[in-house]
Amino acid sequence: MKFIILSTILGLAGASATALTAVPIIEKIAPKSKSCPSGNTDCRTAKQAAPFLINAFKDHDIYDPKMMAAVLALMAFESVDFQYKRNQVPGRPGQGTANMQMANYNLLYAKDIPELAPKFEGVDSVEGMSDDDLNKLLDAVTVDKYNFASGAWFLATQCKQDVKDAFKKDVDEGFKLYIEECVGTEVEPRQEVFNVAKEAFGI
């Protein structure tokens, strides 16, 4: 079943039912997510991640298959198919989530989550934070329900409207703008995963 069908039923079915549909497609985009290496406590399988990903798309009103594909492709690339939620190289404190966000975005993200916001009241910048505090911030946003919502949150709140509009005109141009102008990195190594995601979505 294509994700284009999944996007249609997102608003009609419960998250658990929709997640069952999503699992094989997430596994296509992130093939290593079929299982987790023994001893890797950060890793989550597609089956574990699916309900949180589905809820995130619904919560952030992302129903366009092109944008859903882009978010999943980026998260799969950055987290090595959901095996990691903390930056591994060079091991930067505070950088992580399945979206592998820098610490400044994780602070913004935490302050956008009602359950976490009180913990970071009055904290307006990560500058000057100790490594321990940066990692405590990361710990807060890498609980599964927040970890797997990070990609949808980032696209919905941190990307300009012209980036979102670009997906409607040309999916590859939209992805290019998303990666280069919004995420601020190179599109080329991520394009291969996005090509797989497009196939999964039937785009």
Question: Which role does the model predict for each range below?
Answer:
Residues 1-22, 202-203:
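Fungal secretory targeting signals
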Residues 19-52, 57, 66-160:
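Peptidoglycan-targeting cell-wall enzymes and recognition modules
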Residues 63:
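Contiguous, function-dense segments enriched for cysteine-driven chemistry
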Residues 75-79, 163-188:
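Acidic helix/loop microenvironments that form the catalytic cleft of cell-wall polysaccharide enzymes
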Residues 85-87, 163-165, 190-193:
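A short secondary-structure junction signal
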Residues 145-152, 172-176, 191:
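Short amphipathic alpha-helical surface patches that serve as generic macromolecular interface elements
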Residues 154-161, 181-185, 200:
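Hydrophobic alpha-helical segments
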Residues 189-203:
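C-terminal helix/juxtamembrane-tail motif
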